[in-house]
Regions:
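Broad phosphate/nucleotide-binding scaffolds in NTP-utilizing and phosphate-metabolizing enzymes
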Residues: 1-267, 289-292, 300-302, 306, ...
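Protein kinase catalytic-loop region centered on the HRD/HxD motif
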Residues: 266-275
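Catalytic-loop of the protein kinase fold
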Residues: 275-282
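Short amphipathic alpha-helical recognition elements used for nucleic-acid or partner binding
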Residues: 313-314
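Short helix-adjacent coil turns
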Residues: 322-323
């Protein structure tokens, strides 16, 4: 579909959604409070269904944009049914014909396919909203995968994101300050711009490979620069089982090793190197029989400022140590708490304690009987969403997406370890780098 056609379709959806909310506003004038709430929840669910249906028909960039926006919806007060519908925006697409992919590879790499590779499998290993992946063999016999960007997605990302932002704001789904909403969407735009530039992903791969080269529990594929451009990325092929198969067939020891490694590596990268793999989708991991993990897809990576990481870590550690006043001071520094207010602080403290359930100290089984963090977070989020003195700084958009993704995977692997000790050890590196100490 042309850019004009995409904008027309999204514009029509915006008009319909906005009109539905305006109609409910008028009807609400004569409804009781409970009837208004019930009608608005019903409308959120209907409009989430419309959004999913329209993005599904547009495919490509619109699907990827929709997934990114769906994580912002997690920060606002909409019913669970609407969240569930938005959660159906999977990063999958229909395969692009091999003839089209072959021509794109040859145009990007500047030569006939037969001279560039010993072989390339015409059947894709996978097709996502932004690109398609094929197994291949280099002339020297090295097994690789070749990732090819879909035609036109670079141009569609910005326009689709702008149209969706307009839809959500006009429809009053995102009832937050303009400053906060603008910051969220700037963050999403920045990450999506990077995802459609494979030179950026190649640099990310090299950064993570350098940092993790001596880690015994994970492996990062090597980039083959001679076969890589902005639209084609060639990297070492890793082997292993996808998460569902590993959960079913992996030994308890292997699942324990993998689960602890996922969490440990995440916190080591964040606190020690101020970088995270920001797309912890289950499909971005391959699990070996002994629990070693192959990390895939480095298009979505987030780097952080040292001072910001230091303040965020202080919030986490002070919450873990039950030092509320010190935690609030750092929340103000982060911009998460805009002013000292009793109700906002109570709500933020409950949220922080819920997020921190696995980190309070001693052995803890993620996904075990004592793990009710997910339920406690879900209970407090509606209050967080409507409190104007609480904000989600743009840094949190992908940080908490990544943290939530790791937690979700580990609820299936069920590792048992002292997560509190892991973050204390990792955060000590931040303190050394920033030259601070914690107050007791």
């Amino acid at each position: 579909m042309s850019k004009l056609g995409r904008l027309a379709k999204l514009g029509s959806l915006t008009t319909r959604v906005t009109g539905s909310y305006l109609g409910q506003q008028l009807a609400g004038l004569v409804q009781s409070e409970s009837a208004r709430k019930e009608a608005l929840d019903r409308l959120h669910i209907e409009n989430a269904g419309r959004l999913v249906a329209n993005l599904g028909s547009l495919k490509g960039a619109a699907m990827k944009v929709g997934q990114a926006v769906a994580q912002v919806i997690d920060t606002v007060d909409v019913p669970p049914e609407a969240r569930a519908l938005l959660g159906t925006l999977h990063d999958k697409a229909e395969p692009v014909p091999w003839e089209v992919v072959r021509a794109r590879i040859e145009a990007e790499l500047g030569g006939p396919l037969d001279t560039l590779f010993r072989s390339v499998d015409p059947s894709p290993l996978g097709t996502a909203s932004l690109g398609q992946v094929h197994a291949a063999v280099l002339p020297d016999g090295t097994e690789v995968v070749v990732k090819v960007l879909h035609q036109g997605v670079e141009d569609a990302v910005a326009s689709d994101l702008g149209a969706l932002k307009n839809l959500l704001v006009s429809g009053r789904v995102l009832r937050r300050s303009k400053e906060e909403i603008d910051a969220w969407f700037q963050e999403i735009q920045a990450r999506l711009d990077e995802e459609v530039d494979y030179e950026v992903e190649a640099r990310n791969l090299e950064d993570f490979r350098r940092v993790l080269q001596n880690d015994p529990d994970v492996v990062v594929p090597r980039v083959h620069r001679g076969w890589t451009t902005r639209r084609v990325l060639t990297m070492e092929r890793l082997h292993g089982k996808p998460l569902p198969a590993f959960v079913q067939t992996g030994s308890p020891e292997a699942k324990q090793r993998a689960g602890v490694a996922l969490g440990r590596v995440f916190f080591d990268l964040y606190y020690g190197h101020r970088m995270i793999h920001a797309d912890p989708h289950p499909g971005n991991y391959l699990f070996q029989a002994d629990g070693k993990i192959g990390l895939l897809d480095f298009g979505c990576v987030r780097y952080f400022d040292l001072e910001w990481v230091a303040d965020y870590g202080a919030c986490a550690i002070y919450t873990r140590r039950d030092q509320r006043e010190l935690m609030m001071r750092h929340a103000v520094r982060l911009g998460a708490l805009t002013e000292r207010d009793a109700d906002a602080e109570d709500t933020l403290w409950i949220l922080g304690r819920a997020i921190g359930i696995p980190f309070r100290g001693g052995p803890f089984t993620t996904g075990g009987p004592e793990d009710d963090a997910h339920e406690q977070i879900a209970r407090i989020m509606p209050k967080v969403a409507v409190n104007p003195k609480l904000r989600a700084p743009r840094e949190l958009v992908f940080l908490h997406r990544a943290l939530g993704g790791i937690y979700s995977i580990n609820r299936q692997l069920k590792p048992r370890t002292d997560w509190g000790e892991i973050i204390e050890t990792a955060y000590a590196r931040t303190l050394r780098d920033v030259g601070r100490t914690l107050q007791e």
